[in-house]
Each structure stands twice: as structure tokens, then as C-alpha cells.
Design a protein with these regions (language model features):
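Conserved acidic carboxylate
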Residues: 9
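Two-component/phosphorelay signaling modules centered on CheY-like receiver
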Residues: 12-31, 99
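Acidic, metal-coordinating helix/loop segments flanking the phosphotransfer/catalytic sites
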Residues: 31-53
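Active-site residues of response regulator receiver
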Residues: 57
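Receiver (REC) domain active-site loop signature in two-component systems and cognate sites
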Residues: 60
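Hydrophobic/aromatic residues positioned on beta-strands within the core alpha/beta folds
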Residues: 82-85
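C-terminal output helix
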Residues: 106-119, 123-124
Length: 127
């Protein structure tokens, strides 16, 4: 069974580019254009059980990355989360939220490697 990735990014171009990269190496990807939409997707039990990794942007309208991740954790989701940001100082906003923080930009192979690493951690946690 393939593990789905949930991409949360208000930038359509960035989301589509990352989706194409990840689908190109055999991953299934869902896109949410903001945090609230992602939480709605995850509120469906069938959808939620197939999501194995969340990749989210830091700066988004309506619900910022830290607000989204805090709400995700408050709702009991323990799945791995990667936060992408161009702002090095943003990492401190995620203290205590159990995320992997990565600075943008990075090349496609780095994204693929990161996903493989995070999903590997996920598999070891559930084993």
C-alpha cells in the first residue's frame, strides 16, 4: 500500500511542482491550499488513515504553519510533519511540535531524499 503525502501550501505553483516531483517517484500526493483545508481533509477517517506524511509551508494566510501544526497535534495526529520555510528564524515557532524544519529553496532530489527519510522513520515508529 502506498503512503500518501499531504502537501499544505497556498502557493499553487510550489504545490504543483512538489506534487509532480513526488508523484514522479511513485508517491501519492494530496494538496491543501491552506491549513484549515488540510484539517478538513484529515477529519475524514478514511483519508487520514492513508496519510503518512505532511509537508507544510510556514507562511500561509488564514492559518499559519505553526497554527496548523499546533492544531494538528492538539487533535491527536502524531504523523511526521516537515515544515518548509525561507526564514531561518521561523524554526523557533515550532518548538515542542515535533517537526522536521527545512529551509527553502532546495533541489528536487533533496525533497525526494527527505520524504524517503521521513517515511522510513514513520515505518520504524509503527513497527
Amino acid at each position: 500500500m502506498s503512503v500518501n503525502i499531504l502537501l499544505v501550501d497556498d502557493n499553487h505553483i510550489q504545490a504543483a511542482t512538489r506534487r509532480a516531483i513526488l508523484e514522479g517517484c511513485g508517491r501519492e500526493v494530496r494538496i491543501a491550499l491552506q491549513g484549515q483545508q488540510a484539517l478538513e481533509l484529515l477529519s475524514d477517517a478514511e483519508t487520514a488513515k492513508n496519510i503518512g506524511l505532511v509537508i507544510t509551508d510556514h507562511l500561509m494566510p488564514v492559518m499559519s504553519g505553526p497554527q496548523f501544526v499546533a492544531e494538528l497535534r492538539r487533535r491527536g495526529f502524531t504523523l511526521p510533519v516537515v515544515v518548509l520555510s525561507g526564514l531561518p528564524e521561523a524554526e523557533s515557532a515550532y518548538e515542542g511540535l515535533d517537526v522536521a524544519f527545512r529551509l527553502k529553496p532546495f533541489d528536487p532530489q533533496s525533497l525526494i531524499n527527505l520524504v524517503q527519510e521521513m517515511l522510513g522513520e514513520c515505518m520504524r515508529r509503527s513497527a
